[in-house]
């Protein structure tokens, strides 16, 4: 039986990086040159792409992606659209432009947002389920525009008149949509609107239950989704070295720092974040929550809070466990991100079957219409065809 192939993405740490968590000790200046280094390393090492985080704790993902992309050749960029923060028509134009200037190397991460405090700071005062209503309306308009349709819609949250996109994306009908949402409302939106359902790194049994739940809803609606997972990784040449590195990563984290971080996470209405917090309960004593799955990162970091820990063979075996339950995309990271990008690729890639062979440079680079747009509304070729 042949081993299933996977896509492996890395991570651009636009919110900060360093050798240790929860401290300025060993911290690293994260500037443009450093992010470019990581992106170029990921490109040269053969990663499928990189995820860029979103939110007020990090640099703007669209600006960073458009800045570093010209320094890479094959690397894809998983960048967030934010329903409720962006108009779907403006987001569609941004998407098409970045897809065009990267020659089809854009992936889209749909982020509804699970922190009410941050949401209010950005002008969003809707409750949990209402935000997913906005996400559904947003994605319907957004996908129609990218697919070349004219849009007129009056929804509960979004109203568009004569919406259209003059410059289409390179990828047809649009770049792939990735989406994570563990609540019933999130899953309900995902199965109707996106291509890949994402989960944070829960134990395999819990991930299998979640996948089965999503598939059941999707099958009932005649839809089929693929699945991805977001994990950290601590891989070394021996298991002992890997576990030592895991303990080193949190050696400067104080109990006060953990308590403060957990209070912040507790205010969130994200079901996924709640599930992450339940894995460790804010305590250090039982952080290996499943064989070689360590929850230490989640003591102080929001979002993805678990890491695969072990030697290369062990980490590869755990990845294959997730593959066996339906995961085909792994979004990985490690501290510091430059060194760990090399370490993970050099030690683990040879043990995996990777589906990274597609050559995006073969896509047709649509450089736009010949001649200037007429009246801010028509491409010259279209105007001529109507005469």
Swiss-Prot record:
Concerning SUPFAM superfamilies, the annotation shows: Bacterial luciferase-like
InterPro entries, sorted: Alkanesulphonate_mOase_FMN-dep (IPR019911), Luciferase-like_dom (IPR011251), Luciferase-like_sf (IPR036661), SsuD_RutA_monooxygenase (IPR050172)
At the top of the EC hierarchy, this enzyme's class is oxidoreductase
EC numbers on record: 1.14.14.5
Offer an example of a GO molecular function term for this protein.
alkanesulfonate monooxygenase activity
Q: Which GO terms describe its biological process?
A: alkanesulfonate catabolic process
The alphabetized UniProt keywords are: Flavoprotein, FMN, Monooxygenase, Oxidoreductase
Q: Which Gene3D superfamilies match?
A: Luciferase-like domain
Report residue spans for region: Disordered: 365-387
Q: Which reaction does it catalyse?
A: an alkanesulfonate + FMNH2 + O2 = an aldehyde + FMN + sulfite + H2O + 2 H(+)
Family classification: Belongs to the SsuD family.
Give the NCBIfam families listed for this entry: alk_sulf_monoox, PRK00719.1
- HAMAP family hit by this protein: Alkanesulf_monooxygen
Known function: Catalyzes the desulfonation of aliphatic sulfonates.
Question: What is the name attached to this protein's record?
Answer: Alkanesulfonate monooxygenase
- Organism (species): Bradyrhizobium diazoefficiens (strain JCM 10833 / BCRC 13528 / IAM 13628 / NBRC 14792 / USDA 110)
- Gene name tied to this protein: ssuD
């Amino acid at each position: 039986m042949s081993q299933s192939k996977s896509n492996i993405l890395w991570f651009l740490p636009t919110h900060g990086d360093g050798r240790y968590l929860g401290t300025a000790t060993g911290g690293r200046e994260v500037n443009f040159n450093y992010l470019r280094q990581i992106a170029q390393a990921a490109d040269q090492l053969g990663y499928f792409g990189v995820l860029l985080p979103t939110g007020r704790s990090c640099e703007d993902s669209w600006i960073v992606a458009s800045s570093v992309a010209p320094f890479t050749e094959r690397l894809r960029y998983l960048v967030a659209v934010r329903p409720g923060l962006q108009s779907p028509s403006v987001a569609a134009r941004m998407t098409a432009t970045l897809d065009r200037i990267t020659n089809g190397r854009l992936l889209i991460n749909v982020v509804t947002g699970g922190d009410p405090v941050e949401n209010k700071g950005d002008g969003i005062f809707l409750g949990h389920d209402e935000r997913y209503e906005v996400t559904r309306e947003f994605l319907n308009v957004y996908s129609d525009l990218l697919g070349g349709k004219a849009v007129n819609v009056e929804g509960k949250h979004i109203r568009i008149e004569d919406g259209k996109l003059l410059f289409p994306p390179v990828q047809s009908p649009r770049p792939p949509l990735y989406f994570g949402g563990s609540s019933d409302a999130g899953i309900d939106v995902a199965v109707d609107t996106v291509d890949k359902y994402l989960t944070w790194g829960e134990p395999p049994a819990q991930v299998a239950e979640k996948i089965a739940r999503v598939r059941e809803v999707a099958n009932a609606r005649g839809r089929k989704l693929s699945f991805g997972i977001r994990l950290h990784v601590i891989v070394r040449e021996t298991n002992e070295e890997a576990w030592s590195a895991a303990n080193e990563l949190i050696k400067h984290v104080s109990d006060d720092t953990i308590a403060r971080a957990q209070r912040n996470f507790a205010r969130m209405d994200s079901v996924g974040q709640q599930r992450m917090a339940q894995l460790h309960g804010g305590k250090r004593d039982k952080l290996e929550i499943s064989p070689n799955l360590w929850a230490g990162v989640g003591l102080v970091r929001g979002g993805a809070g678990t890491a695969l820990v072990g030697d290369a063979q062990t980490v590869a075996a755990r990845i294959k466990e997730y593959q066996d339950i339906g995961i085909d995309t792994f979004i990985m990271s490690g501290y510091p991100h430059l060194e760990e990008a090399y370490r993970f690729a050099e030690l683990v890639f040879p043990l995996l079957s990777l589906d990274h062979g597609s050559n995006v440079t073969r896509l047709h680079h649509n450089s736009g219409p010949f001649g200037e747009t007429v009246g801010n509304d028509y491409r010259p070729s279209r105007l001529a065809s109507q005469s």
